[in-house]
Curated annotation (Swiss-Prot):
UniProt key word Transferase: no
Biological function: Represses the expression of the murPQ operon involved in the uptake and degradation of N-acetylmuramic acid (MurNAc). Binds to two adjacent inverted repeats within the operator region. MurNAc 6-phosphate, the substrate of MurQ, is the specific inducer that weakens binding of MurR to the operator.
Domain spans labelled SIS: 128-268
CDD domains given in the database record: SIS_RpiR (cd05013)
Gene Ontology MF terms: carbohydrate derivative binding; DNA binding; DNA-binding transcription factor activity
Taxonomic superkingdom: Bacteria
InterPro entries: Homeodomain-like_sf (IPR009057), HTH_RpiR (IPR000281), RpiR-like (IPR047640), RpiR-like_SIS (IPR035472), SIS_dom (IPR001347), SIS_dom_sf (IPR046348), Tscrpt_reg_HTH_MurR (IPR022821), WH-like_DNA-bd_sf (IPR036388)
Key words, A-Z: Carbohydrate metabolism, DNA-binding, Repressor, Transcription, Transcription regulation
Positions of the HTH rpiR-type domain: 1-77
Name the record gives this protein: HTH-type transcriptional regulator MurR
Single GO biological process annotation from the record: regulation of carbohydrate catabolic process
The organism of origin for this protein: Escherichia coli (strain ATCC 8739 / DSM 1576 / NBRC 3972 / NCIMB 8545 / WDCM 00012 / Crooks)
Subunit structure: Homotetramer.
Length: 285
């Protein structure tokens, strides 16, 4: 379940005691084998129940399950570290050669994919695919890089017969949102989940009775609280990156999975439409 990743992405919503626990676990992950919740509570000056509740908040049944999972994650991470050149673990710097930058970016994208896929709740994903498949109309919202991901998904969905709107202009996005109806779906893409334009559109969609599906990070956010369904994405950040590259990689992995899942639901008809689309575009060459 990648608890270290969940801890990192949920930090903004931790209480003071929860932050103490998170800091301790990360600082001592290599030594957790010999740490009990009682010892930890005493050292941090908090109650054992606080530690158990923290573990449950992350999705574990209790501290023992969380502790063992963290030990396993640490061991797996060490194995990967030993297999990679040490200089690939730092952020990209202005002194890096293009070859080193390429290797770092590649690894960053790999991690974004691995961590995002590890967080998938596939039963929930299947339910989301079914909800989208029944929608008379689908709106996709997003800003910046997220808008590019949304536009790509909209083209894919239109290719297999879905009625989709994905407008770049935020005023148009808001206008479409207020016209949605019960049964319609809004797919809101925002890693932060706090962009006011996207939140406004989600509020309008909910008010109209549409189903809101958020593709966002694990952190608590206004969009996450508004959504009927969430699809979690994980992405690291680096100092010398001018664009959210790994974020888009993670988001694309989610949208591509949605698309393939929808094709699978109605494979014969979907493949016919994809073939017709290909034949038509070939005639334009």
């Amino acid at each position: 379940m990648l608890y270290l990743t969940k801890i990192r992405n949920a930090e903004s919503e931790f209480t003071e005691n929860e932050q103490k626990i998170a800091d301790f676990l990360r600082a001592n992950v290599s030594e957790l084998q010999s740490v009990s919740s009682r010892q930890m509570a005493k050292q941090l000056g908090i109650s054992q129940s606080s530690i158990v509740k923290f573990a449950q908040k992350l999705g574990a049944q209790g501290f023992t399950e969380l502790r063992m999972a963290l030990i396993g994650e640490y061991s797996a991470s060490r194995e990967k570290t030993n297999a990679m050149a040490l200089h690939l673990h730092s952020s990209i710097t202005s002194d890096d050669s293009l070859e080193v930058i390429a290797r770092k970016l590649n690894r960053e994208k790999e991690l974004a994919l691995e961590q995002t896929c590890a967080l998938f709740d596939y039963a929930r994903l299947q339910k989301i695919i079914e909800v989208i498949s029944k929608a008379p109309f689908i709106q996709i919202t997003g800003l910046g890089g997220s808008a590019l991901v949304g536009r790509d998904l909209s083209f894919k969905l239109m290719k297999i017969g879905y009625r989709v709107a994905c407008e770049a202009d935020t005023h148009v996005q808001a206008t479409v949102s207020q016209a949605l109806k019960k049964g319609d779906v809004q797919i809101a893409i925002s890693y932060s989940g706090s962009k006011k334009e996207i939140v406004l559109c989600a509020e309008a969609a909910r008010k109209q009775g549409a189903t809101v599906i958020a593709i966002t990070s694990l952190a608590d956010s206004p969009l996450r609280r508004l959504a009927h369904f969430t699809l979690d994405t994980v992405s690291g950040e680096t100092e010398w990156r001018s664009s959210s590259m790994s974020t888009r990689t993670a988001q694309n992995s989610v949208t591509d999975l949605l698309f393939v899942g929808l094709v699978q639901l109605n494979d014969v008809e979907s493949l016919k439409m994809i073939q017709r689309s290909s034949e038509l575009t070939q005639r334009l060459k």
